[in-house]
Amino acid sequence: MAPALVSEALSRLGLHQAYALVADHALRRAGQDRLSFFSLDLHRDAASRVKVYVSHDDAGVRSALLAAAAVPSANPDLVRAFCALLGEGISVFGGRPLISSYTFTEANAAAPATYSLYLPIRAFVPDDQTARDRVRALLDRHGIDRSVFDRALAEVSDRELRDGVGLIPHVALRTGTVRPGITVYLSAEAYSTTPARARFDQLAHA
């Protein structure tokens, strides 16, 4: 059902080749690659965005590289380094999926303008101190001032970072012709904090 709906939606928006491109590059593993989200800007001009998200269960870097190859201007070296820095020592990202996102515009209907890769870092670290250190290393590699990230993290929570995991749930890499960069997502932990040791034990016995 979802593939047909997404294909039809893209066609109605004038992006007639978009679904085939997404399927060829990101929906390659039956039962493991799946459409997750579909979004669009609610205004009409040539720069209005249509975005398609694909989740990759139990995926390695190769799946991300194949997905990124749909965008001619995407940098595969950035994708490799992103996965290596945040998923230190991990060859298969299990438990929580990697997520690919494609941004299409009417002005560039033949191919996506950008490719984004979302990595659920909380699933692959023992605690938020480790997550913070890996994010800092990533920001340094991209020449981004880490002080903004540090201030935001301090404002969101005053607990010891080594005492929990999940304060930094996802990190995203955006590569392509439109505003390449890094996005770091923070959680308010409004209901509870996942204990660091509990999370580590779950990973060890997964």
Enumerate the predicted regions with their spans.
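Extended, well-ordered protein cores
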Residues: 1-15, 19-51, 55-57, 70
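C-terminal structured domains
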Residues: 49-206
